[in-house]
């Protein structure tokens, strides 16, 4: 039916929404627009296809597809998410389904509908368990088609939009991962603006943000035990098949994590069961015999839908551009949701992940110097590892959550998590200053085995409260985590021939040693207890003030001397001021601390004081198109104390009776700025891009963390065509980083040498074609121009190359 007065339904909805928001819409005008079409809303069936998304954008799309005027106040639907509707429905049925679980009601007036949301204190709307789950972790990104999130809760445990959050945060959504084939956490981090991925070797990567290694991981908001980067033990191997999105909160995050890194926290949000039956099968094949398969099935398990489940399995078998290296990974995931009553939901689940490599490189992929101190020049395919070398790692997790919706908008949640991270690593690789003049070389062979068992508990309450005539929000909670790391190391080998005669043509063929008895034992127990609180005070309609803090007790006991921090207080202060309906300015302050690893000892053999620092941040954020597009610009400073640095003066002495190698704690300061944009630029056009600049200097003014580039740029985008090409989606992106360098000690020549990685671009492309409604085919091309670059220089005087050009073809069937 044509729109009266020559206005499209979307234009009418926009104009009437503005009038409605300002309360100046005359009743006669509303009647004049709606009377010619009275009764239409309830009368005709319409073909709908609206995926879950921000409620404001869903209402606009509903108005367009139904040719109906939709009136609503933007502030009432902000932070809410629609349900999906698909198929032939009467508009009144469709809008009811669209609004399910939002707390919104609809009033029909001919061909116009008015959406309203009751005040929380007076609402009798049934807040179902699905809504609670979604809101407490933020909005689900799966099936949204978006590169930006709706709401997030990583920063303060309060559920906020990116614009309302007084810290920088980047979210890599499910759509972004699917478009660019981001199948593991390493891939996701490489696409995350402001993050540097440094490869220690074939199976260990480290992530950096704002000049600091990231050791803070969360799973559904539950902090995991801070990982030991040297052993990795699973965190950096997470397969993305089981996750809805990855949230990266930049800067100090002590409010919810307690002890941890100053750089960032990575929060992996698991996929949840759906109310409708759905699933997919995906198969892929790519460069270097890279094969991957994935199965995902979800839906209700009872007729009423009060029990829902989801199962995911993925398997990958891949070789590499590196000689004699291959890796098999497998992941299995299951989750169940039980609606115990209309206000209470129980969630239980488990996941199982294995990483089984062969031919693992160790401490880089090739040595930088030969025995004469000359720089080695080897091909990208060179692999220093023996064929039997394997850094096998695994993760086992079981978890349970209980959520209850109390009266007046309050929600309580109890979360339990049990995790086992393990490794079994018989390792052999050419390490040191090789080859000799006769082209011979020696390998270093050692074995590491171990397992960390951890248990985490988090309990919190959140909800609104009244103070001085205004409504505010509060979160109060407590958490506890316990972990036990047991390990063995083997390196005292006897009668082992570790020599190869041909370094240049090394193919990994060498005998495996008899490991004998352990040379070292690890038996560390870590306990962290904490209580936290955050309040969001609505000081005025435009100003929100955040006040909070955490009290931490942290203790490590074991074979090394006990490390303890008791009653440590971590403050959190933030403010957000709305300049208008689009832009907000913000400022925040918080800090964090992390006890030093046991080998960071001073010249008196005393463990260094905990690394600690304060994070200051100011910025401006923008929100466009009802939250479908978000922007941010931030300036930050991090003031660090007790950064571990080599004590060069002490270590240069010929004899050191107290300790052979000493460190000292120094002060350092990071200054930088970030700009980011994510979301929908226009219908069908998604983007995520960011630029980061930072400089880290110690208290003498010298630059530190120079291997992490000062400048980084990331841009990824996709476009779904309309009209005759509406089955085609194309996309691409690029990552650029400025020059970085590392000082490496040349032992044969007894001097330090500077190794640099010049600035470089990496370009990726993707395309997807929707063959049928259920079947699609995709291709991803990474490093299109086959750029040669290093992902690490200097780790044990070695280096590692990044991946050359590679392709991946995949096909997906949805059901």
From Swiss-Prot:
Induction: By the siderophore, pyoverdine, and under iron starvation conditions. It is a multi-pass membrane protein. It comes from the Bacteria. Receptor for the siderophore ferripyoverdine. One of its GO terms (cellular component) is cell outer membrane. This is Ferripyoverdine receptor. Belongs to the TonB-dependent receptor family. Keywords: Cell outer membrane, Ion transport, Iron, Iron transport, Membrane, Receptor, Signal, TonB box, Transmembrane, Transmembrane beta strand, Transport. Residues 1-43 form the signal peptide. InterPro entries: Plug_dom (IPR012910), Plug_dom_sf (IPR037066), Secretin/TonB_short_N (IPR011662), TonB-dep_rcpt-like (IPR039426), TonB-dep_rcpt_b-brl (IPR000531), TonB_rcpt_b-brl_sf (IPR036942), TonB_rcpt_CS (IPR010917), TonB_sidphr_rcpt (IPR010105). The lineage of its organism: Bacteria, Pseudomonadati, Pseudomonadota, Gammaproteobacteria, Pseudomonadales. NCBIfam families: TonB-siderophor. A motif (TonB C-terminal box) lies at residues 798-815. The keyword Cytoplasm does not apply. GO terms for biological process: pyoverdine biosynthetic process; siderophore-dependent iron import into cell. CDD domains: ligand_gated_channel. Residues 161-271 form the TBDR plug domain. Pfam families: Plug, STN, TonB_dep_Rec_b-barrel. The keyword Ion transport applies. It is found in: Cell outer membrane. Residues 276-815 form the TBDR beta-barrel domain.
